[in-house]
Amino acid sequence: MNIFRFLGDISHLSAIIILLLKIWKSRSCAGISGKSQLLFAIVFTTRYLDLFTNFISFYNTSMKVVYVASSYATVWMIYSKFKATYDGNHDTFRVEFLIVPTAILSFLVNHDFTPLEILWTFSIYLESVAILPQLFMVSKTGEAETITSHYLFALGIYRTLYLFNWIWRYQFEEFFDLIAIVAGLVQTVLYCDFFYLYITKVLKGKKLSLPA
């Protein structure tokens, strides 16, 4: 495992911890898109169906368990534990416009036409756009809490570091996964505007807002 993947995993874990602590400590999921969290739960479920059949390392298996468990814990807190604080009026992105096209694409463009491989490919495509409901929600409300901004920034850094991970693997391992690279590029591009606002506003102590 190279340093970029390790740092990417740390950034991803940081994002998860930030989100879970934000919801649990404030006893509120206000400002958090339940739809994005549902999409992430679908992403990790379909990606790690090989959890009990394909052992690579303790680290790898542990990360899979953490991602799946934390995604469902987040969904549970939003739609059950703290349901009264969920802002469904602003979380209105039509997720079927993300799920259906990525599902179709996973059947058309994949590495191997087998159930597990198609589901893995679907998870890669879906993850690249899963944050859109959250960004759409921030755009509709006009602002985001600072802690929510930290969560989004950590997620964006995770994806950016994973792009460097693919570059490193191509350079030193001659491993090239076009599907993962293109999906990662799409996801990173979606965060670009947010990165700019985060650096120019949040890091200067101002509240983040996206243009409506």
UniProtKB/Swiss-Prot annotation:
One of its GO terms (cellular component) is Golgi membrane. Keywords: Cytoplasmic vesicle, Endoplasmic reticulum, ER-Golgi transport, Golgi apparatus, Membrane, Protein transport, Receptor, Transmembrane, Transmembrane helix, Transport. One of its GO terms (molecular function) is KDEL sequence binding. Signal peptide: none annotated. The record marks D193 as: Important for recycling of cargo proteins with the sequence motif K-D-E-L from the Golgi to the endoplasmic reticulum. Residues 47-48, 159-169 are annotated as: Interaction with the K-D-E-L motif on target proteins. Residues 1-4, 53-58, 111-116, 169-178 are lumenal. It holds the Pfam family ER_lumen_recept. It is a multi-pass membrane protein. Its main location: Golgi. One of its GO terms (biological process) is retrograde vesicle-mediated transport, Golgi to endoplasmic reticulum. Residues 204-207 are annotated as: Important for recycling of cargo proteins with the sequence motif K-D-E-L from the Golgi to the endoplasmic reticulum. It comes from the Eukaryota. The keyword Endoplasmic reticulum applies. The chain crosses the membrane at residues 5-24, 33-52, 59-79, 93-110, 117-135, 150-168, 179-199. Disulfide bonds: none annotated. The keyword Protein transport applies. Residues 25-32, 80-92, 136-149, 200-212 are cytoplasmic. The record marks R5, E117 as: Interaction with the K-D-E-L motif on target proteins. Receptor for the C-terminal sequence motif K-D-E-L that is present on endoplasmic reticulum resident proteins and that mediates their recycling from the Golgi back to the endoplasmic reticulum. Belongs to the ERD2 family. This is ER lumen protein-retaining receptor 1-B. The gene is kdelr1-b.
